[in-house]
């Protein structure tokens, strides 16, 4: 996480846009790959992380303007979790690190929101978040987008569009890792290899920095096909190899660089 004052100031600035009501910001949960306990790598919602900083699943942030308080709702670690995962810092401790004094179990959120007016939230891209919010707010999930706060969406976009020095440094870190991904491809590409062999080398680079890739790597000799995620072709001399890739840093900032390279073997 960044310095706690960063998150305090971001929340304060967002709150200044509204005179009453409350702001609800959804974090992400795990997404199952083929069963509940086998999941895709966890990626926290960028807006939740921007204001609350915690890279953990199942959290919801509340900025309550009427009551002048800030809360994180979630399910803290149980003894069963500790047996499986080892000793962990409790989520209520992480909340304090971003200057949130109140951490409340997630099951209490619906009661907290009862009879409240001006509950502001943004559009959601994950179905489980749509269904959860629809349930606790008693709205039709098929009409979810009719209930979002466009004033909140605009305020968040306006604030997040302006990058401070700390964010620029984090973006540069992600771009530098992305640079290594491209340089590795340039050094290791050779005629006769499969595209997926080069993809494996490219995607290895961010893992060396506790990073991930910011989107599915596009690497293809058939660059005329937009967003080609197949990597089964054999590379040959004279191919124009397209690489579009990026790194997602451990602080949640991304790189995204695109290039084409002529494959030309040189005898030494």
Regions found by a protein language model. Name each.
Residues 257-261:
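Conserved small/polar residues in nucleotide/adenosyl-binding loops
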Residues 1-179:
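A composition/biophysics-driven feature that prefers long, compositionally simple stretches
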Residues 163-187, 193-210:
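Active-site pocket-lining segments that scaffold enzyme catalytic pockets across diverse folds
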Residues 53-55, 64-65, 224-253, 264:
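Acidic/histidine-enriched ion/cofactor-binding microenvironments in catalytic or ligand-binding pockets
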Residues 36-37, 209-223:
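Short, basic/aromatic beta-hairpin or loop at an interaction surface
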Residues 31-34, 80, 128-129, 205, ...:
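Flexible loop/turn segments at secondary-structure boundaries
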């Amino acid at each position: 996480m960044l310095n706690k004052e960063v998150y305090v100031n971001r929340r304060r600035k967002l709150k200044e846009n509204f005179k009453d009501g409350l702001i609800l910001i959804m974090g992400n949960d795990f997404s199952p790959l083929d069963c509940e306990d086998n999941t895709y790598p966890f990626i926290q919602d960028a807006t939740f992380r921007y204001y609350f900083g915690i890279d953990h699943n199942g959290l919801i942030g509340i900025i309550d303007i009427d009551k002048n308080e800030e809360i994180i709702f979630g399910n803290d670690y149980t003894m069963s979790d500790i047996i499986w995962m080892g000793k962990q810092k409790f989520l209520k401790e992480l909340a304090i690190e971003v200057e949130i004094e109140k951490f409340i179990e997630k099951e209490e959120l619906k009661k907290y929101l009862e009879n409240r007016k001006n509950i502001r939230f943004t559009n959601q891209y994950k179905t489980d978040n749509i269904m959860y919010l629809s349930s606790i707010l008693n709205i039709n999930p098929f009409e979810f987008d009719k209930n979002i706060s466009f004033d909140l969406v605009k305020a968040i976009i306006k604030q997040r569009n302006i990058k401070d020095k700390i964010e620029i440094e984090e973006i540069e870190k992600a771009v530098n890792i992305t640079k290594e991904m491209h340089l590795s491809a340039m050094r290791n590409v050779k005629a006769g290899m499969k595209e997926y062999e080069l993809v494996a080398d490219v995607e290895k680079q961010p893992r060396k920095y506790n990073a991930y890739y910011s989107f599915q790597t596009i690497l293809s000799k058939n660059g005329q096909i937009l967003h080609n995620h197949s990597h089964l072709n054999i590379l040959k001399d004279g191919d124009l190899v397209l690489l579009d890739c990026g790194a997602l840093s451990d602080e949640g900032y991304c790189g995204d660089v695109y290039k084409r390279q002529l494959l030309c073997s040189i005898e030494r």
